């Protein structure tokens, strides 16, 4: 067997449908499009969501939600991630260097997901009540 002798398995390939080539083909005259109407014409399709002039669903329903402009500037760090950090003093710069928050991040908040078993000092970061309690229970502290 060689690459130039490879062929698809028998019956794996279907012949292209040749429409509009006489009544003997079974797909002559109307070529599978039926009789008259917009969809039988060339170029005769309406845009997606068009409901024949009726107010479309996406315009009938109210707008909802918004895109926060500050989302990319606020980071979120888990307690479990702080456990893996090689430093004892955690601040925004340490988080950026460790890759836990993005370069554009201007502030970060610690959330109580995971466990913290070692003592750390947190500087200039926010924390949830649960995260603050877990850090202080492990012997850590917050320096503002």
Swiss-Prot record:
According to the UniProt record, where is the region Disordered?
A: 1-59
Biased-composition ranges for Gly residues? Answer: 21-31
**GO aspect biological process, one term:** translation
- Which Pfam families has this protein been placed in? Ribosomal_L27A
Q: Which GO terms describe its molecular function?
A: rRNA binding; structural constituent of ribosome
Q: Which domain of life is it from?
A: Bacteria
Query: Which keywords describe this protein according to UniProt?
Result: Ribonucleoprotein, Ribosomal protein, RNA-binding, rRNA-binding
Q: Which Gene3D superfamilies match?
A: 3.100.10.10
Q: What do the Gene Ontology cellular component annotations say?
A: cytosolic large ribosomal subunit
Which NCBIfam families has this protein been placed in? rplO_bact
Q: What does this protein do?
A: Binds to the 23S rRNA.
Tell me the protein family, please: Belongs to the universal ribosomal protein uL15 family.
Instruction: Describe its assembly.
Output: Part of the 50S ribosomal subunit.
- Name assigned to this protein: Large ribosomal subunit protein uL15
UniProt organism field: Burkholderia thailandensis (strain ATCC 700388 / DSM 13276 / CCUG 48851 / CIP 106301 / E264)
Q: Which gene encodes it?
A: rplO
């Amino acid at each position: 067997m060689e690459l130039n002798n490879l062929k698809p398995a028998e019956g794996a390939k279907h012949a292209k449908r040749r429409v509009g080539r006489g009544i003997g083909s079974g797909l002559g005259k109307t070529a599978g499009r039926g009789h008259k109407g917009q969809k039988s014409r060339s170029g005769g399709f309406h845009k997606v969501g068009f409901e024949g002039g009726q107010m479309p669903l996406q315009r009938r329903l109210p707008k909802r939600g918004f895109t926060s402009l500050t989302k990319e500037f606020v980071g979120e760090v888990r307690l479990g991630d702080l456990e893996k950090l090689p430093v004892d003093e955690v601040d925004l710069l340490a988080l950026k260097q460790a890759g836990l928050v993005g370069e554009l991040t201007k502030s970060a908040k610690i959330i109580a997901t995971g466990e913290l078993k070692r003592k750390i000092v947190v500087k200039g970061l926010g924390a949830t009540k649960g995260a603050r309690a877990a850090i202080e229970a492990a012997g850590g502290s917050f320096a503002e």
